[in-house]
A protein has these predicted regions:
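N-terminal extracellular ligand-recognition/capping segment immediately after the signal peptide
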Residues: 28, 55-64, 72-96, 102-110
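Acidic Gly/Asp/Thr-rich repetitive segments characteristic of extracellular carbohydrate-active
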Residues: 29-75, 661-667
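All-beta strand scaffolds that present successive hydrophobic residues in beta-strands
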Residues: 75, 97-99, 121-123, 154-157, ...
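Right-handed parallel beta-helix
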Residues: 84-208
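Extracellular calcium-associated, cysteine-rich motifs in secreted modular proteins
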Residues: 425-503
Length: 685
């Protein structure tokens, strides 16, 4: 008995020690230098490695072909140059695009838009230069240069985006995203858009959205537009810091309806095309959703007259020093159109929108605005090998210049990428810079790591499996190689800054529910968290992140194994004017036509939320059936039942003599420290 008690005590102490150690261990970031709300995205970590070996639009080993392969994936490049697309391109869930691997000058995607259509995505060191060559061919209204919306878990790092038909770089309506160290330049004004003049920088927002150390240059407006989406409009939390905004036109930065936003240490530099007077001093022109707006766009009715909260400090305007001494007086308050707020802008409102402490945000290196100006100009965009266009944008910003201007426009703004053609250039001139390629390093096993690098790090260049071995650092061997290619940039860009915000520790975030919505869909009938519905193709989405379900039909949700669900909340409406729908069955229990009713989409209210406690928790699958012949639009949240006690099971396995750190990562060559081996605590001294 004494021996048994000693063993139990030892196990308890080991468990407590492991939990305590885990509580001090930060989750592994996407890569060194990944910051903000998207800091912990995993992308294609642990998945297959795919090589882009040509610059064709499609076909074997093209970028499109690589993106179309199923499963988690990391895409590396064996070639540099410009990929001229013949149709739009989308990036699916669980993908890492490692543009820094391109041998030579890097990769550019041109002619058609590229967007992110899935969850859990990392994109680094890429160029997206759309242009208007196809605006008349395919009716390119609404073509953004890059971005996406209504998904979750992205980080976009060191990308260069230019020449959009609509916005250059729009990322909004998502959960947990970061856009960092990007160069966003020269959206097109009179490019052929059916709505006429555009030339917009981007829409930025989301439920946990970070935008830091980006250069926004030569846009007529939306630099950025602080843009809520219906999916996130009641939980808009955005951190915007250390961005450089040069030669902003029109309304500059504006919007922010109902949002909570940190606007910290940004550098505003009015250029030759910027407005003078109060608009030239603008930090952000904030407002609300008005009666007129929600009448036209009823999906935004939940945020009617909702004022946001803003933490604004440390922002600098290079032309108007009074802004620097009082951000709120000159950059915020005097930018509000009180007459356009349905009479809601009162003295009390004025006091309520200004907050004295920042909203919660995830760890981000923060510089002064002046220091950020230099850092961004030195390192933003696809800066591993800057092309001539990015170099021009940097030069314009440094020198307060507008080298090229389109017909009929203020200085620095263009109608087409061809407006950048130098005088005297030949007929073979192209707006897209030449990107030279060199020979890709030899990679015998195709695991994304060159042979000589594997040799130098004690790996086997004939076995691809070692690329996905997780090291003591929390990164796979492949990730360590990918990160090493730009380690010097990462170190230099963050020097002289202070890491502010909170980090997330291992085990700190406990999942309490699963969501099935347009936002969590992976682009098909699979969803974040390992959920699946027994349908094929892609789900159609309704308003506010809902998914459309046929009437009088039973659906089966496949749940993660052995996770108990005890409560279901359904937000939704009937996708028909003047008609209702209802929930006919859930988890095997049937309901009448008046129990859980969903109103017509044109009713008032036009949606409803029902929370249903299950008679007993269900595991593995959950069924629901729509009632009436009308289509229903649902957002479904499933609460995970809490359990108490410890289930004791008998389990035997072959011995595993590998060492693991407290995050569960297998360690190939352990150094001094605490490890787990065969379930026992091992200390190497």
């Amino acid at each position: 008995m004494t021996s048994l008690l000693n063993k139990l005590c030892s196990l308890a102490l080991l468990f407590i020690g492991c939990v305590a150690a885990m509580a001090q261990t930060e989750k592994t970031p996407a890569f060194p230098g990944a910051e903000g709300f998207g800091r912990y995205v995993t992308g294609g970590r642990g998945g297959k490695v795919l090589h882009v070996k040509n610059l064709k639009d499609s076909g074997y080993q093209s970028l499109r072909w690589c993106l179309q392969q199923t499963g988690a994936k990391t895409i590396v490049f064996d070639v540099s140059g410009t990929i001229h697309l013949t149709s739009a391109l989308s990036i699916p869930s669980n993908t890492t695009i490692a543009g820094q691997t391109a041998p030579g000058d890097g990769i550019c995607v041109a002619d058609y838009p590229c967007s992110i259509s899935g969850n859990n995505v990392i994109v680094r060191y890429m160029r997206f230069r759309l242009g208007n060559k196809n605006v008349k061919i395919d009716g390119a209204d609404g073509w953004d240069g890059f971005g996406g919306f209504d998904k979750q878990d992205w980080i976009i790092d060191h990308c260069s985006v230019s020449w959009s038909i609509d916005e250059c770089l729009s990322v909004l309506g998502n959960k947990n995203t970061t856009v960092q160290w990007c160069l966003v330049a020269q959206s097109l004004v009179n490019s052929g858009h059916s709505k006429g003049a555009h030339g917009y920088g981007g829409n930025w927002g989301g439920s946990g959205a970070s935008f830091h150390h980006n250069l926004i240059v030569h846009h007529t407006s939306r630099t950025p537009r602080l843009g809520p989406r219906p999916t996130t409009q009641l939980d808009e939390r955005m951190d915007m810091r250390n961005n450089v905004i040069y030669n902003f036109g029109g309304n500059g930065c504006y919007g922010g309806e109902g949002m909570k936003v940190n606007i910290v240490n940004n550098y505003y530099k009015p250029g030759p095309g910027s407005p003078t007077g109060d608009k030239g001093k603008r930090i952000a022109g904030i407002g609300i959703r008005t009666n007129s707006y929600v009448t036209t766009y009823p999906a935004y009715a939940p945020a009617l007259h909702l004022w946001g909260k803003y933490y604004v400090t440390g922002n600098v305007n290079s032309k108007y020093p009074e802004v620097n001494t009082n951000n709120w007086a000159y950059g915020m308050y005097n930018q509000i159109d009180a007459s356009g707020c349905d009479g809601t802008y009162t003295a009390a409102t004025k006091d309520s929108i200004k907050i004295d402490e920042p909203i919660d945000f995830i760890a981000t290196t923060t510089h002064t605005a002046q220091k950020a100006y230099e850092k961004v100009l030195d390192y933003a965009g696809a800066s591993k090998s800057r092309d001539t266009f990015d170099a021009l944008m940097i030069s314009d910003t440094r020198n307060n210049a507008a080298t090229y201007t389109g017909s009929g426009l203020s200085k620095g703004f263009i109608n087409s990428q061809d407006d950048n053609k130098p005088s005297g250039a030949g007929s073979d001139w192209s707006a897209w810079p030449t990107l030279n390629s060199t020979d890709a390093p030899t990679d015998t096993d195709g695991d994304g790591m060159p042979d000589d690098w594997e040799d130098a790090h004690g790996l086997d260049k004939t076995k691809s499996a070692d690329g996905n071995i997780v090291t003591e650092s929390g990164y796979t061997n492949l990730e360590i190689y990918l990160n090493s290619l730009v380690a010097d940039i990462t170190e230099q860009q963050n020097a002289d800054g202070e890491l502010l915000g909170r980090t997330i520790k291992v085990g700190e975030e406990v999942l309490t529910e699963y969501e099935i919505s347009g936002q969590t869909s992976n682009g098909d009938w699979t969803f974040a968290g390992g959920l699946k519905i027994n349908q094929t193709g892609s789900p159609a989405t309704g308003s506010n992140g809902t998914i459309k379900y046929s009437g009088n039909k039973k659906y089966t949700i496949t749940l993660p194994v052995n996770v108990p669900i005890d409560q279901v909340t359904i937000y939704g409406y009937c996708n028909s004017d003047g008609n209702q729908s209802y929930l006919a069955e859930l988890a095997g229990k049937t309901f009448g036509s008046t129990d859980y009713v969903f109103p017509a989409r044109n009713a008032n209210p036009s949606s409803v939320t029902h929370t249903i406690k299950l008679d007993a928790p269900v595991t593995n699958t959950l069924t629901f059936t729509t009632g009436s012949s009308n289509q229903s639009c649902y957002k479904i949240n499933m609460h995970i039942a809490t359990t108490t006690g410890i289930n004791s099971i008998n389990y035997t396995k072959e011995k595993d003599n590998y060492f693991y750190n407290l995050q569960g990562a297998r360690i190939m060559n352990p150094t001094k420290g605490l490890y787990i081996q065969n379930g026992k605590k091992i200390v190497i001294r």
